[in-house]
Each structure stands twice: as C-alpha cells, then as structure tokens.
UniProtKB/Swiss-Prot annotation:
The chain crosses the membrane at residues 118-138, 154-174, 181-201, 210-230, 250-270, 281-301, 325-345, 355-375, 399-419, 423-443. It is found in: Cell membrane. SUPFAM superfamilies: Glucose permease domain IIB. It comes from Bacillus subtilis (strain 168). This is Putative PTS system EIIBC component YbbF. One of its GO terms (biological process) is phosphoenolpyruvate-dependent sugar phosphotransferase system.
C-alpha cells in the first residue's frame, strides 16, 4: 500500500471512530495534531483511536486532539478533509447546528477561546519561522567557522533569504489575526504595514518621533483586531454598491490614526514589559527560575496552555533578536525521553516496551506527545520525575543564558536554531535532562506494579 493510501486509510478510520462525517463540527491541525470538534462527543471512541496504527496518542480536551506527528499530520488532514467535504442533507445540518451551538456554549470559556484564537493566528506561521531560522542559523554558523566570508555574495544571498520573514512578520500576523476575528485578510496585512512602515520615522506626535516597528507584534495584533471589528461595524451602514470603496478606506483611515496614537505606544509598553519581565526573571532568578520554568512546562503541554506562549517567543525574537525562554522549556521533552528510557530498561512488560520504543524516536526529535500521553502520564510517577529532570536541564540552560534565533520543535533539531556560539551548551543541557530524567525515574519513578494497564 502506497503512503498516500496509508494516509487515506488512517483518515477513514479516524473519521469512522469519530462518529462519521455528520458528527464533525470542525477540524484543524497544528504541527503534530489533528484537532477535531465533534457535534456529539459520546460518538467519538478515544480508546479505539489510540489503538490505530499511525496514531501516537489522543488528548481529550475542548477538542479531540489526535497526535500523528510532524509531516504525517498534513497528509492525514488533507485526506480527512476530502472525506468530510461531501454535502450533507439539510436535516442533518439543522440538527448538527443545534448540537454545535450547545457544545460551543459549554466550551466557550473566555480563556479557552483566547487560546484558540492565539493558536490559530501563530501556529500556521511556525513552518515559515523554522525554515527562516534554520537558514539564518546555519549561515551564521558557517560564517563564524570561517568557511564563508560575511561579505561574499553567497553569504549575503543566504542572509537575505533567511531574514526576510523576520522583517515582514508583522504583515503575516496581521493577515491571520484579521481573518481570525472576521475581517478581510488584506486589511489585516495593512494593519501590519502600519506598524513596520519605515516612513513612520517622519511622524512626530506629542513632541516625539515614532519608531518603525514600535509596538512589535503586540501592536500588530491590536491594529489587526481593531481593523477587523471596524470593518464589520462600518459595513452595517454602507450601501452594498459603495461597500468595496467606502468600507476598506474608512476602516484603514480610522485604524491608522488609532494605531499611531494608541496601539503603537501601548503595544510598545506591553512588549517592553514582557521582554524586560522575562529577562529580569531569568537574570534575577537564574538557576532557580530555569528549574521552575523547565519543570512546569510539561503540565502546560498536557493542558494545552503552552500554545499561549507562542506569541511570547515571537515577541522576544522580534524585540531582542533571540529567545532565551525556548531552550529552557525545550528541556521538558528531554526529561520525558530520559524517564521513558528508564521505564524501558526496568520494565518486563512487552506492551509497555513496545509503546516506548515507538515514541522514543519522535521524542528525540522534539515531538513529546507520544511519550507523555502514551507512557509517562498514564503511569503517573514517571511524569513527575521527567518534570524534575527537565527542571535540572532548564537550570543549566538558564545559567548559561542559551538562546535561539527562531522557534521550532524542541529536542535535537532545536540545536540548529540556537545561537551558533551556544550550540554545544544547548546539547550538553539536553543530555543533562536526558540523564536526570533517566536517573530519577530509574531510582524513584517506576515499578512494574504501576503499569497494570499495559498487561
């Protein structure tokens, strides 16, 4: 069976175990997970989904999150989309709409909705950030090693290719933010341009000249969300024949004025507070701060709250050019790898060893969900010892102030995104987390009596 057929077969089985296409309210995907919102949750068989070949784990939260891994999730989602796109009967749609409204009311807590919006804005940008970050990082490493002159045309071309995204990132954030809040994507792009336009330097307000980029991605978010709501409000009063001319023009004019008077200063204040606050925590807290941040990241992953950190990482890179937080948090996955390997060594249960063997390769490559949801979390104590191991590695990263130049998956691949002069330090910290997670779990974290579910 070809790979495409495998993806189609897996998508078909997932759809069946989620209650069929008439039970699918909505679906999307991130880097590793297919996220499905069923109309009727009772029709989705999470246990059966976990047993499917190709499924690395299942998380039952406000959405049904099926962990498939990087790369695979794109193909399976595409196949899944084709399967659910067939037209449904009107009676099914009517009943489904009522059920969807009930589910939305149940899940529509402000905090969950906020995280969902944030994820939808920033997660689609991660592949571009990884690509640009890798090209930039590798180019800097080659130049630093003396293999290429910084003034050579090859180095200049590679630098331009890698840096372009970070120059115009505000435009992409504006597009996604406006679309997410019901506006026109092109107007969202204009909201981003309002912040990064070099001509801003000619504007002087309240006795001070404006700085291009001031407000950062926070300012872009404010402007893009504002222009989306402004557009919707104005459209209510404009005749359809004039809508295409009046609505975008007035929306842009109002948003531009409000952006320069309010959003840029406010966004700049918040951006400075986030950046200086985190840097102060790491500077003052040092090893202790690194330990706490590293040890508490995995519980955030379990609850899905880690998605809220994506704009923080981006803002750090946008503001100071690097991210000292990501290497610390990346130790969470490394602690899991060490803990899972300790269980693998100690256990005599074939089913458990098979589950660990399947999850370790992806864990080493920065995809920790299979080990978290398939091994350490169900066992209980190994999850805690993994967190402690992660904290020890996080303390190491904080002490040496290791930072990345872009965001991406953790584990070994993140070493390509670390500042070239700190790659060895990052890898050392990674292996410290592996070792700490292993030793703590081997000594205190596991007995075969804990694994009755793997009999």
């Amino acid at each position: 069976m070809s790979k495409e057929n495998n993806y189609h077969h897996l998508a078909q089985k997932i759809l069946e175990l989620c209650g069929g296409k008439s039970n699918i309210s909505s679906y999307t995907h991130c880097m590793t997970r297919l996220r499905i919102t069923p109309y009727d949750e009772s029709k989705a068989d999470a246990q059966a989904l976990r047993k499917l070949d190709g499924v690395l784990g299942v998380v039952e939260a406000e959405t049904l999150q099926i962990i498939l891994g990087t790369g695979v999730v794109n193909h399976v989602t595409a196949a899944f989309s084709k399967l659910v796109s067939a037209e449904e009967g009107a009676d099914v749609k009517e009943a489904a709409a009522k059920k969807k409204a009930d589910i939305n009311r149940k899940n529509a807590t402000p905090f969950k909705l906020f995280l969902r919006k944030i994820a939808s804005i920033f997660i689609p940008l991660i592949p571009a950030l990884v690509a640009s970050g890798l090209i930039t990082g590798i180019t800097k490493a080659i130049i630093q090693a003396g293999w290429l002159s910084a003034d050579s045309q090859i180095a200049i071309i590679l630098t331009v290719i890698g840096s372009g995204l970070f120059t115009y990132l505000g435009i992409l954030v504006g597009i996604n933010a406006s679309k997410e809040f019901g506006g026109t994507p092109a107007l969202g792009a204009l909201a981003g341009i309002l912040i990064i336009n070099p001509e801003i330097a000619k504007i002087s307000l309240f006795g001070e000249e404006l700085l291009p980029g001031r407000g950062g991605l926070i300012g872009v978010l404010f402007a893009a969300i504002f222009i989306a709501y402004t557009e919707q409000f104005i459209r209510r009063f404009i005749p359809q024949s004039l809508d295409i001319i009046v609505t975008p023009t007035v929306s842009l004019l109002i948003t531009g004025i409000v952006t320069y008077v309010v959003f840029m200063p406010l966004g700049g204040f918040i951006s400075d507070a986030i950046t200086s606050g985190l840097l102060s925590i790491l500077d003052i807290g040092g090893i202790a701060a690194g330990f706490i941040l590293g040890a508490t990241f995995l519980p955030l992953v379990v609850t899905g709250l880690h998605q809220g950190l994506t704009p923080v990482h981006m803002e750090l890179i946008n503001s100071i050019g690097n991210d000292p937080l990501l290497p610390i948090l990346a130790m969470g996955g490394a602690g899991q790898v060490g803990a899972a390997f300790a269980v693998f060594v100690k256990t005599k249960k074939t089913t458990l060893r098979k589950a660990i063997a399947g999850g370790l390769p992806s864990g080493l490559l920065g995809i920790g969900e299979p080990l978290i949801f398939g091994v350490t979390l169900p066992l209980g104590r190994p999850f805690l010892t993994a967190c402690l191991g992660a904290g020890i590695g996080g303390a190491f990263q904080a002490y040496f102030q290791v930072a990345t130049i872009a965001i991406g998956v953790s584990g070994l691949p993140l070493s390509f995104l670390v500042l070239p002069s700190q790659i060895i330090l990052y890898i050392v910290g990674l292996f410290i987390s592996y070792a700490a997670g292993f030793l703590l779990t081997y000594a205190f974290g596991y007995k075969d009596e804990m694994a009755s579910q793997f009999d």
